[in-house]
């Protein structure tokens, strides 16, 4: 259905002056270092590592797609190629694995005005965090908005952009945490 001549083929979707890469890289054949951050000491150590650079990628993992009606289930960060940190959130409570406790520990990081926050659809992440009383300060760079500027008609999912511009096929979020909603 997605070839010229077939019903449902959208020629505009294929039309682009931007180069396309073949997504031949994936988690199986690309070196990576992913770390799960659990506990107060690990969070303090993580903050020191992540603030070594002033450009930090952030993503929130939530229970749904409506930022006004979701619970936080985790936060992911990166400041170096092929390196990532994941902070799981068990519930919305004040306990050591609860969102309020974890976000309070991360508050100095979020309030650092020297950091540039990078992400895909940052408005969503910022709104989710705002519901928990967290305001990210500093500059922002949204890959979804940047892609819109260079290719207004293109598709913008993070997986598609990763394949198109990095040649990397990411593990889908559904495979990691299950279907949202």
PLM region descriptions:
Residues 39-54, 107-111:
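A short acidic-Thr-Gly-centered motif at the start of a beta-strand
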